[in-house]
């Protein structure tokens, strides 16, 4: 045996343990939180798992699952181009939020802080529900105190979105009448 491989003195050795303990460092990206960015990322993940390039079984497009009629309202007329352009999708989402905030501004002021069907009503919950079911259906839900709880084609209700997306700070979104991308 060569002298370089001989053990001449006691050596510290680590033996395998019965259980391996892994230490992980948690990294919290800036979008995890209660800001507009946190809101849009959470909603985008719920709608499409964050996939910009997906079309669902009902023809809704992109990360935020927009319908053609809603896109047309905001001045987007080419669905193929929309689907391939993440930046356009982000602009369209913001534009739609400003539009819904304009349509629902009086209802936001009237119902914010109240409880309907056990759900605390917040501005962000209202805007998320409007993204799901349309501003008119959210108005009906609020004004009927939850008796008109419309669901989408997959069975997700207005009250579910009100709860899931409540509590975000959307003060950065300014209401705008008839906005265009």
Regions found by a protein language model. Give the residues of each.
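Short glycine- and hydrophobic/aromatic-rich loop-to-beta-strand nucleating segment
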Residues: 64-66
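Short Gly/aromatic-enriched secondary-structure transition segments
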Residues: 57-61
């Amino acid at each position: 045996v060569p002298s370089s491989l001989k053990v001449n003195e006691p050596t510290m050795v680590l033996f395998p343990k019965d259980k391996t303990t892994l230490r992980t460092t948690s990294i919290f990206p800036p979008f995890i939180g209660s800001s507009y960015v946190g809101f849009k990322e959470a909603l985008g993940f719920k709608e499409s798992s964050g996939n910009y390039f997906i079309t669902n079984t009902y023809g809704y497009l992109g990360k935020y699952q927009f319908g053609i009629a809603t896109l047309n309202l905001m001045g987007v007329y080419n669905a193929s181009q929309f689907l391939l352009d993440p930046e356009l999708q982000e602009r369209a989402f913001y534009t739609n939020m400003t539009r819904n905030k304009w349509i629902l501004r009086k209802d936001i002021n009237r119902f914010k802080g109240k409880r309907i069907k056990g759900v605390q009503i917040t501005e962000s919950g209202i805007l998320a529900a409007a993204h799901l079911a349309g501003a008119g259906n959210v108005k009906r839900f609020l004004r009927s105190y939850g008796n008109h709880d419309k669901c989408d084609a997959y069975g997700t209700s207005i009250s579910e979105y009100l709860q899931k997306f409540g509590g975000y700070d959307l003060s950065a979104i300014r209401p705008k009448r008839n906005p265009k991308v």
